[in-house]
C-alpha cells in the first residue's frame, strides 16, 4: 500500500517482489561499500603528506583493481539473472486475463470465461467517497484469487502503455500489435494499486490499475455474478 512521503518500496505481496527487494538490498550494500572505499581514498589523498613520485608501475595493484570489479559484477549479475528467469517462468497458470491499454483507461478480459469483460476507468476526484484514494480508484476492479498463479496478457489498442503494479513486482509494456505476458501470485488478500508507467498522452496520469486479491471461493462467486 503506498502512502504519502514514502521513500522505500511498497510491502512485497508476491514472491517475485520479495526477491526484487532482497536484490535491491544486496546491490545497495555493494554500492555503499564501493562508495565508502572511494571516499576514504579521496580523503586520504587530500590529507596525507606522503608522495610516491618514483613509482612507475604496480602490477599487483593493477591486477587487483582489474579482477575485483569483475568479481563484483558477477556477484550482481548472478542473482539478477536468477530473478529475470523467475519472472519469465509461467507454468500451468490457474487463470489467464488479458489487459488492453486505451487512451486513457484499461479493459480486461477473463479468457477462461465466455463473457467476462469490462472497462476500468479512474473515478474522478469529485465522485470519491471517504477512504478512497485520489487518482488511484477505479469503477471496476480486477478481482483475482490469491495464492494461485495468474497469467496476464498485455497489449494496447492505440499507443504504448505500461501495466504496472509495484507491490507485486509487475511492469510490462502494452504495445500495439504485440502481446506481452507476465505472471503474478499474491501471497495474501488485499487491494493493490498501480498506474500506467509509460507516457501515453495528456491523461497518462489518470489510468490507474486496481487488483483485488481474494479467496478462491469469493472469486468464483464474483465471476458467476459478472457473467
From Swiss-Prot:
Catalyzed reactions: 4 Fe(II)-[cytochrome c] + O2 + 8 H(+)(in) = 4 Fe(III)-[cytochrome c] + 2 H2O + 4 H(+)(out)
UniProt binding sites for Cu cation A2: 196, 198, 200, 204
Enzyme Commission numbers on file: 7.1.1.9
Residues annotated to bind Mg(2+): 198
Subcellular location: Mitochondrion inner membrane
Keywords in alphabetical order: Copper, Electron transport, Magnesium, Membrane, Metal-binding, Mitochondrion, Mitochondrion inner membrane, Phosphoprotein, Respiratory chain, Translocase, Transmembrane, Transmembrane helix, Transport
Subunit architecture: Component of the cytochrome c oxidase (complex IV, CIV), a multisubunit enzyme composed of 14 subunits. The complex is composed of a catalytic core of 3 subunits MT-CO1, MT-CO2 and MT-CO3, encoded in the mitochondrial DNA, and 11 supernumerary subunits COX4I, COX5A, COX5B, COX6A, COX6B, COX6C, COX7A, COX7B, COX7C, COX8 and NDUFA4, which are encoded in the nuclear genome.
UniProt-recorded name of the protein: Cytochrome c oxidase subunit 2
Amino acid at each position: 500500500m503506498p502512502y504519502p512521503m514514502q521513500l522505500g518500496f511498497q510491502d512485497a505481496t508476491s514472491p517475485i517482489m520479495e526477491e526484487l527487494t532482497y536484490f535491491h538490498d544486496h546491490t545497495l550494500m555493494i554500492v555503499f561499500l564501493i562508495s565508502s572505499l572511494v571516499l576514504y581514498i579521496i580523503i586520504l589523498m587530500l590529507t596525507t603528506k606522503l608522495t610516491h613520485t618514483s613509482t612507475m608501475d604496480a602490477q599487483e595493484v593493477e591486477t587487483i583493481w582489474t579482477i575485483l570489479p569483475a568479481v563484483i559484477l558477477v556477484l550482481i549479475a548472478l542473482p539478477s539473472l536468477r530473478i529475470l528467469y523467475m519472472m519469465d517462468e509461467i507454468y500451468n497458470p490457474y487463470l489467464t486475463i488479458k489487459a488492453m491499454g486505451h487512451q486513457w483507461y484499461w479493459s480486461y478480459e477473463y479468457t477462461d470465461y465466455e463473457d467476462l469483460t469490462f472497462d476500468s476507468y479512474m473515478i474522478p476526484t469529485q465522485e470519491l467517497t471517504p477512504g478512497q484514494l485520489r487518482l488511484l480508484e477505479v469503477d471496476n476492479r480486477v478481482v483475482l484469487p490469491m495464492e494461485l498463479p495468474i497469467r496476464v496478457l498485455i497489449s494496447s489498442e492505440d499507443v504504448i502503455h505500461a501495466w504496472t503494479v509495484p507491490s507485486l513486482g509487475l511492469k510490462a509494456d502494452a504495445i500495439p500489435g504485440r502481446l506481452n505476458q507476465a505472471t503474478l501470485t499474491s501471497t495474501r488478500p488485499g487491494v493493490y494499486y498501480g498506474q500506467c508507467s509509460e507516457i501515453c498522452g495528456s491523461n497518462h496520469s489518470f489510468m490507474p490499475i486496481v487488483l483485488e486479491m481474494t479467496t478462491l471461493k469469493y472469486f468464483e462467486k464474483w465471476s458467476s455474478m459478472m457473467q
